[in-house]
Amino acid sequence: MTFIDKIRGHWARRMTVAAVAALLLPGLVGVVGGSATAGAFSRPGLPVEYLMVPSPSMGRDIKVQFQSGGPGSHAVYLLDGLRAQDDFNGWDINTNAFEMFLDSGLSVVMPVGGQSSFYSDWYQPACGNNGCVTYKWETFLTSELPEWLAANRDVAATGNAAIGLSMAGSAALILAAYHPDRFIYAGSMSGFLNPSEGWWPFLINISMGDAGGYKANDMWGPTEDPNSAWKRNDPMVQIPRLVANNTRIWVYCGNGQPNELGGGDLPATFLEGLTIRTNETFRDNYIAAGGNNGVFNFPNNGTHNWAYWGRELQAMVPDLQRVLG
């Protein structure tokens, strides 16, 4: 192959990616974080509380949906997708997660809000369509919230689980990588597990722009900046930390083929098919690094849709009970 052919191939691939993104991302970002499932709220009568938890780092109170697992219980933190709303957490809107954990002995913690945040501490103010706010979600989830819950709801401040889908899949792994005392368990469903690689920053930036008007550079800095936080927040890069911590991890991703659960629309199938590659590579690299405390579930079906994530969470409950105690 000549040098010119290589260049042509390189630019052809880049143009293909750009064209696909331009055509599909308006639909994709509507499903990043999942297609909604109408009427999936947990049934009335569950002991769910709506808390307002102070966040000094973000300068405001953060709404948290909470269900106690009993005095001194450990907690499962369920993190939302890219289009996280300010009224309810997507896990409650689209699944019966609270009911799954009723009488399990585990508390459920659902932070509300954080659209396009990747649950990260941003480099700069998060400026979007509705103005600017401070995003210090990592600080909130690993310091302010667990300490508040320990003091006010008798929830264990350490030894908990972080589980997320889509943007929050990578976030859950990063929280556990850097805060192994807080999170001994990390679950990722259809997560973007190599966000600093190739054209992922480009796609993430476009998605964040559509989901609230945010900019990826405000979050982690320019990718070309050696001091940017892209690699710091890349689960693939942080595999050695997860292995050294002996974090229990559960990684799920479909292949873009729908089954009886549905989710056969083009955005849901395309995005899951796009995501599976980094998930498989993450598994291979994790095992090669000596990791031996993980579950990897890559079925021959599944799309970027809440129906699949709800089913996977249900499958995780016994493992969460065993590990968290």
From Swiss-Prot:
Question: Which source organism does the UniProt entry give?
Answer: Mycolicibacterium smegmatis (strain ATCC 700084 / mc(2)155)
The UniProt entry's coiled-coil ranges are none
A single Gene Ontology CC term = extracellular region
- Region Fibronectin-binding: start-end pairs: 98-108
Q: Which EC number(s) does the record attach to this protein?
A: 2.3.1.122, 2.3.1.20
Residue positions binding substrate: 82-83, 166, 274-277, 304-306
Q: What does this protein do?
A: The antigen 85 proteins (FbpA, FbpB, FbpC) are responsible for the high affinity of mycobacteria for fibronectin, a large adhesive glycoprotein. They also help to maintain the integrity of the cell wall by catalyzing the transfer of mycolic acids to cell wall arabinogalactan and through the synthesis of alpha,alpha-trehalose dimycolate (TDM, cord factor). They catalyze the transfer of a mycoloyl residue from one molecule of alpha,alpha-trehalose monomycolate (TMM) to another TMM, leading to the formation of TDM.
User: What GO MF terms are annotated?
Assistant: diacylglycerol O-acyltransferase activity; trehalose O-mycolyltransferase activity
Q: Out of the domains of life, which is the source?
A: Bacteria
Name assigned to this protein: Diacylglycerol acyltransferase/mycolyltransferase Ag85B
**SUPFAM superfamilies per the record?**
alpha/beta-Hydrolases
Concerning what turns on (or off) its expression, the entry says: Expression depends on the two-component regulatory system MtrA/MtrB.
List, from the UniProt record, the residues annotated as the active site of this protein.
166 (nucleophile), 272, 304
- Key words, A-Z: Acyltransferase, Disulfide bond, Secreted, Signal, Transferase
Concerning its family, UniProt says: Belongs to the mycobacterial A85 antigen family.
Catalytic activity entry: 2 alpha,alpha'-trehalose 6-mycolate = alpha,alpha'-trehalose 6,6'-bismycolate + alpha,alpha-trehalose; an acyl-CoA + a 1,2-diacyl-sn-glycerol = a triacyl-sn-glycerol + CoA
The protein's gene is named fbpB
Q: Does the keyword Secreted apply?
A: yes
Q: Where is the signal peptide?
A: 1-38
Query: Where would you find this protein in the cell?
Result: Secreted
